[in-house]
């Protein structure tokens, strides 16, 4: 039998609990994901889910977005060589490790090199890579300046640029995308995308990209882009194995330099057959820092994969 005192104490305890709750002690809400998309376009509404079209494949190892070669039709223009300082990376840009083993890409009209783009904006000079007809993947610091808290002005994007030669001309940016985590300068979220004014990807093609939770140590990859220590607008590459495979970063000893930020870290002949061609595993972001002897790129995680896919889809 329950005593009257016990009932009374229970009622008082309940009333106190209700009073405290009503004074603002509400259940804690989950913090927004640092991968939540942010755009330079105020009208942009971030997707809360992702749609995988038939070009997205999956297997027991992960997800894959298929590559596309494009038509390759050249529309060459000659322009004055532009010299602009590389965009400031969050850490060291002096990323040549030992001897410089980069080699110049002399035929930038060959796929996939024509799908690698030179980016020039108010932030500086960078590299990017096509992931769809109108979408370029790049580093977050190439399009959003954390020191000023602002996006870059309109960028000029030149696929397959080769010095003063622009085999496919140049196109302008229309808007930018980054994850919210990059606004605070957290390098785990140093990635983004550029939407273009024209579907140049139909001509130059675009890269596949993939997500996997498996270790990528030993995987042979290539980094190709537009370094600031070489003749302006020339593309250079270096291949080698991934040395360290982390949750958010991949580390490697391939030589890079400022201006190559945003370059694809990709498998040339992908063992990931669902990519159907060159397959990017990360976005190159920075050089040696923090006691490591390796350069680094932001790894394509499930969240990065979904953001790139949504940004690509929103441009079509």
From Swiss-Prot:
InterPro entries for the chain: Glutamyl_endopeptidase, Peptidase_S1_PA, Peptidase_S1_PA_chymotrypsin, Peptidase_S1B, Trypsin_dom, V8_his_AS, V8_ser_AS
EC identifiers of the protein: 3.4.21.19
GO cellular component terms attached to this protein's record: extracellular region
Alphabetized GO MF terms: serine-type endopeptidase activity
Main location per the UniProt record: secreted
Tagged with keyword Cytoplasm: no
A family per Pfam: Trypsin
Disulfides per UniProt: 126-142, 275-279
Intracellular or extracellular location(s): Secreted
Superkingdom of source: Bacteria
Signal peptide: 1-30
Annotated propeptide span(s): 31-94
Stated family: Belongs to the peptidase S1B family.
Protein name: Glutamyl endopeptidase
Species: Bacillus licheniformis (strain ATCC 14580 / DSM 13 / JCM 2505 / CCUG 7422 / NBRC 12200 / NCIMB 9375 / NCTC 10341 / NRRL NRS-1264 / Gibson 46)
Gene label: blaSE
């Amino acid at each position: 039998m329950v005593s009257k005192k016990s009932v009374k104490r229970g009622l008082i305890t309940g009333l106190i609990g209700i009073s405290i709750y009503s004074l603002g002690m509400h259940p804690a809400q989950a913090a927004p994901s640092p991968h939540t998309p942010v755009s330079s376009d105020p009208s942009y509404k971030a997707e809360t889910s992702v749609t995988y079209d038939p070009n997205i494949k999956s297997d027991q190892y992960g997800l894959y977005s298929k590559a596309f070669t494009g038509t390759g039709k050249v529309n060459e223009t000659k322009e004055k060589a532009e010299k602009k300082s590389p965009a400031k990376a969050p850490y060291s840009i002096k990323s040549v490790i030992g001897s410089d083993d980069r080699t110049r890409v002399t035929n930038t009209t060959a796929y996939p090199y024509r799908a690698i783009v030179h980016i020039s904006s108010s932030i500086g000079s960078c590299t990017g890579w096509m992931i769809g007809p109108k979408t370029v993947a790049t580093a977050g610091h190439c399009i959003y300046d954390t020191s000023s808290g602002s996006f870059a002005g309109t960028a000029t994007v030149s696929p397959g640029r080769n010095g003063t030669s622009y085999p496919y001309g140049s196109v302008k940016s229309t808007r930018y995308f980054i994850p919210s985590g990059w606004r605070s300068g957290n390098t785990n979220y140093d990635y983004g995308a550029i939407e273009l004014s024209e579907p140049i990807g139909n001509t130059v093609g675009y890269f596949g990209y993939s997500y996997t939770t498996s270790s990528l140590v030993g995987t042979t990859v290539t980094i190709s882009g537009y370094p600031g220590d070489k003749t302006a607008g020339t593309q250079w590459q270096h291949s080698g194995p991934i040395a360290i495979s982390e949750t958010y970063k991949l580390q490697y000893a391939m030589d890079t330099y400022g201006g190559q930020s945003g370059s694809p870290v990709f498998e040339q002949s992908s063992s990931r057959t669902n990519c159907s061609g060159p397959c990017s595993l990360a976005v190159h972001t920075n050089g040696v820092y923090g006691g490591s002897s390796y350069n680094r790129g932001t790894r394509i995680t499930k969240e990065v994969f979904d953001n790139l896919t949504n940004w690509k889809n929103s441009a079509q």
